[in-house]
Amino acid sequence: MSRTNFNDLLEAGSHFGHLKRKWNPAMAPYIFTEKNGIHIIDLNKTVVKVDEAADALKQIAKSGKKILFVATKKQAKDIVADKVKAIGMPYVTERWPGGMLTNFATIRKAVKKMATIDKMSTDGTFDNISKKEKLQISRERAKLETNLGSIVELSRLPAALFIVDISKEHIAVAEAKRLNIPTFAIVDTNSDPNAVDFAIPANDDASTSIALITGVITKAIEEGLAERKVDKETQAEEKEGTKTSRDEAEQLSAGAKVKSSNDGEAKGGAGKKPRRKINS
């Protein structure tokens, strides 16, 4: 059963593309028709592509790896932040930090700087500096948080990127491609679907379309995380069961050895004749 359907996508306005004069010819396979100078996306193909992307991302989440969401356009940032925050995945909804992926070591230094400032505020260091210095450090920390967002929790490169509007986020797409990081994206009629690994043909401007598709994707990831948790619990139970069985077997074996030893002593004692008393 599909994770979404034609009617839901239609109601969300996912079928509306861009003006014909702004189209990217590579999107031709996903265009159903043209109406009033606007390309109409074939939602039957969108349903298929949503399922493909959702299933792949579910498996990535199940493996325990991180998926980075990128959506800095006004109508997408709040929607994506809310939905992605709920599943504990990192996201960038402000400006994309250049070199975020290709120069990840430098980004990590900025993250460590944030951590250092946080430590200063709790270990009493702030009490020994002037108000001016304190204000400067606080502003620096706020700027870092705005630029880095939730990626402060990202200790290593993400296993995949999910992007809203690859034309706007072309730098993120290019960095991911350079590092062979799989890319998933909502791709409108003005963009090249071949620029990403999993393209979902749909309106990437309407908030309703973005919310619907992002919601389906985050739900699939949530399923993957839940299955991972169940698998880990099952493995722990099996491991504990194996240990218990081994301990019981060792106890039985030890008990059998003791019994065998006692039986041997008893038999040896029974075979001896009592010593004859000699009268002097």
Briefly describe each language-model feature range.
Residues 1-3, 223-280:
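Intrinsically disordered, compositionally biased charged tails
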Residues 2-233:
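Ribosome large-subunit tunnel/peptidyl-transferase-proximal elements
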